[in-house]
Regions:
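Charge-dense, helix-prone N-terminal extensions
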Residues: 1-109
């Protein structure tokens, strides 16, 4: 079950996706799908220019994905003081990024 968090703007992922560069849309979809496989408590917070994935409604985010022209800027947060920024290219292998995201998700209590 996909849970959505409304930030008052009632913006859906589909609305967000339409505004992203078509080159990065498939990669955003893959990242989104992966994040939801991490657990039933993953919450999606769709913002104007990015999508944040959080663990439960406590909204402890673990990944912030902001589409660029031909890449996605990812901020991966393992703890409140530890954020890693990664530029994910459209042809880049996702395995390493998925491992970082999983580690960040698992580190949130």
């Amino acid at each position: 079950m996909i849970e959505l968090f409304s930030n008052g703007m009632n913006r859906s992922y589909d609305d967000f996706r339409k505004e992203a560069d078509p080159k990065v849309q498939p990669l955003m979809d893959l990242l989104r799908k992966f994040c939801f496989t991490l657990g039933s408590n993953v919450v999606e917070d769709v913002r104007i220019h990015r999508v944040m994935f959080c663990k439960s409604f406590a909204l402890r985010w673990f990944v912030d994905a902001e589409p660029q022209k031909d890449s996605i800027l990812l901020k991966i947060q393992k703890s409140r003081g530890e954020t890693q920024t990664v530029q994910l290219g459209i042809d880049q292998d996702l395995a390493n990024i998925q491992a970082l995201i999983r580690e960040a998700y698992d580190s949130i209590h």
